[in-house]
Amino acid sequence: MVQSCSAYGCKNRYDKDKPVSFHKFPLTRPSLCKQWEAAVRRKNFKPTKYSSICSEHFTPDCFKRECNNKLLKENAVPTIFLYIEPHEKKEELEPQEQLPSPSPPTSQVDAAVGLLMPPLQTPDNLSVFCDHNYTVEDTMHQRKRILHLEQQVEKLRKKLKTAQQRCRRQERQLEKLKEVVHFQREKDDASERGYVILPNDYFEIVEVPA
């Protein structure tokens, strides 16, 4: 007799080529056997000596490692089951009445004045129109702000250029002063006496002791 799994909905049958083992109900241990029966959850099911459950309904810790996971531990209980509830008849839903889709607003002619009137603003297209206005206003505000920032940058650039020119002039003046000081030192070192040049109305050079 080919062994098959007694679990509800399980179609596993013994096949030597498949790594599925089958385990008999522990009929000699009534308390443990009742736990197996409760786990199977089959109404009016009474296991016999031929009844068995396949290894797919046991967790790995239920097996003895030294036996290559082929033998169950003494108190192992199957706990992995897929319970399928009986199919209930689905209530047929009445088809919902489809509401006519709103037609887009169209321009109308006013019979009193004979002029083409703009389409009526419904809540939907009104919100779109308002959003569009907000977008345009935001864009204009951003453009003005960018223009203002560009003007400030240009002013700062001009100030920086002026400051750089002033700095270069001061550097040139400093270099000239350094040259004068250097020349004066060389002149003082070369002569043993110092002279003071008086204005031209003195018409002479007064010698001053060094």
UniProtKB/Swiss-Prot annotation:
Main location group: nucleus
Superkingdom per UniProt: Eukaryota
THAP-type zinc finger span: 5-57
Gene Ontology MF, one: protein homodimerization activity
Coiled coil: 140-187
Chain ranges for the short sequence motif HCFC1-binding motif (HBM) as given in the UniProt record: 131-134
GO cellular component, one term: PML body
Gene3D superfamilies per the UniProt record, alphabetical: THAP domain
Keywords: Cell cycle, Coiled coil, DNA-binding, Metal-binding, Nucleus, Transcription, Transcription regulation, Zinc, Zinc-finger
Biological process according to GO: DNA-templated transcription; endothelial cell proliferation; negative regulation of transcription by RNA polymerase II; regulation of DNA-templated transcription; regulation of mitotic cell cycle; regulation of transcription by RNA polymerase II
Function text: DNA-binding transcription regulator that regulates endothelial cell proliferation and G1/S cell-cycle progression. Specifically binds the 5'-[AT]NTNN[GT]GGCA[AGT]-3' core DNA sequence and acts by modulating expression of pRB-E2F cell-cycle target genes, including RRM1. May also have pro-apoptotic activity by potentiating both serum-withdrawal and TNF-induced apoptosis.
Binding partners and assembly: Interacts with PAWR. Component of a THAP1/THAP3-HCFC1-OGT complex that contains, either THAP1 or THAP3, HCFC1 and OGT. Interacts with OGT. Interacts (via the HBM) with HCFC1 (via the Kelch-repeat domain); the interaction recruits HCFC1 to the RRM1 promoter.
Protein name: THAP domain-containing protein 1
UniProt organism field: Rattus norvegicus
